[in-house]
Amino acid sequence: MAKLTKRQKALEGKVDSLKLYAIDDAFKIVRDCATAKFDESIDVSVQLGIDAKKSDQVVRGAVVLPNGTGKTKRVAVFAQGAKAEEAKAAGADVVGMEDLAEQVKAGNLNFDVVIASPDTMRIVGTLGQILGPRGLMPNPKVGTVTPDVATAVKNAKAGQVQFRVDKAGIIHTTLGRRSFDGDKLKGNLQALIEALNKAKPATSKGIYLRKVAVSSTMGVGVRVDVASINAAAQG
């Protein structure tokens, strides 16, 4: 096990790993401990009360964070005709068909999100081995295979994040940047929690939102009291 640096020890000394912090306090600690010389990403992990081995309990979806992510995303769209024009008007960075597929095959993947009109899947389907491992393969479950490509582009540009439970039943995603104030981070977390609640499998039993922890790129993890998230949303 790697030794902790003096900086890491000092940061961990500011957090009680056994304590559940109220949402406002949790974000204050995380932001105070994000002392790197760059605008650290603020991330969240949510452990769900599901069995990820069961196909009917795989939680997957997307949500537009109301305060964005702090990152400008490049969006590629597979579309033709009027759909292609709509995608361009909505702000897509790259729009194409076979020509875009050739770019992908050549390894030119200078984009963060790929969106596809349903009628283009005959082309996009051949790119699964390239796009899939990079998390770029369009999927209707997260709104990236859709006839409404314009809205999908706008959502991606507005700060939409995709989420999918891992084998341990945990969701990992970003909430923003160190430069965001606590209220913006809180609003984004509440939007994510609302989306996760809507995506709850009917077969999930017991407590659904089991653990929530927030952290920064180079900082510490802080556990959040789920009740405080719900209370803040209702208040």
From Swiss-Prot:
Listed Pfam families: Ribosomal_L1
Keywords: Repressor, Ribonucleoprotein, Ribosomal protein, RNA-binding, rRNA-binding, Translation regulation, tRNA-binding
Membrane spanning residue stretches: none
Listed GO biological process terms: regulation of translation; translation
Gene Ontology MF terms: rRNA binding; structural constituent of ribosome; tRNA binding
Superkingdom per UniProt: Bacteria
Gene Ontology cellular component annotations, sorted alphabetically: cytosolic large ribosomal subunit
Task performed by this protein: Binds directly to 23S rRNA. The L1 stalk is quite mobile in the ribosome, and is involved in E site tRNA release.
Subunit structure: Part of the 50S ribosomal subunit.
Protein family membership: Belongs to the universal ribosomal protein uL1 family.
The protein's name: Large ribosomal subunit protein uL1
Species name: Methylibium petroleiphilum (strain ATCC BAA-1232 / LMG 22953 / PM1)
